[in-house]
């Protein structure tokens, strides 16, 4: 996928999950959506800033550190932990969903900067 496609995917996912943030039973979907949108924003940001990106979330933190994007790597790894707790575990409260959206906002801002 090209940078433009990653940006469109991120924007589409954000438009879908942000309205759900106030729906308590939607926390799992909000967290997963924030994670997915963040992945696409990272791909977009890497493509536009470094002329390369990774099409897999596997070892994405390592890839980002190699590019000198340590802060983004930490945001990604934080969000990945929230996702694991939200999707596979019991951490599905609105606070976790809100945290996921806050991390997404940081990544979104970085990608467009």
Feature-to-residue mapping (PLM):
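Terminal alpha-helical segments
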Residues: 1-113
């Amino acid at each position: 996928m090209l940078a433009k496609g990653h940006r469109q995917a991120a924007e589409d996912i954000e438009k879908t999950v942000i309205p759900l943030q106030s729906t308590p039973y939607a926390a799992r979907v909000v967290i997963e959506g924030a994670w997915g949108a963040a992945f696409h924003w990272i791909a977009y940001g890497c493509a536009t800033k470094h002329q390369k990106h990774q099409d897999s979330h596997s070892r994405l933190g390592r890839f980002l550190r190699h590019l000198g994007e340590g802060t983004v790597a930490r945001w990604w790894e934080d969000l990945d932990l929230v996702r694991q707790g939200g999707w596979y575990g019991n951490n599905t409260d609105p606070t976790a969903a809100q945290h996921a959206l806050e991390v997404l906002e940081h990544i979104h801002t970085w990608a467009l900067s």
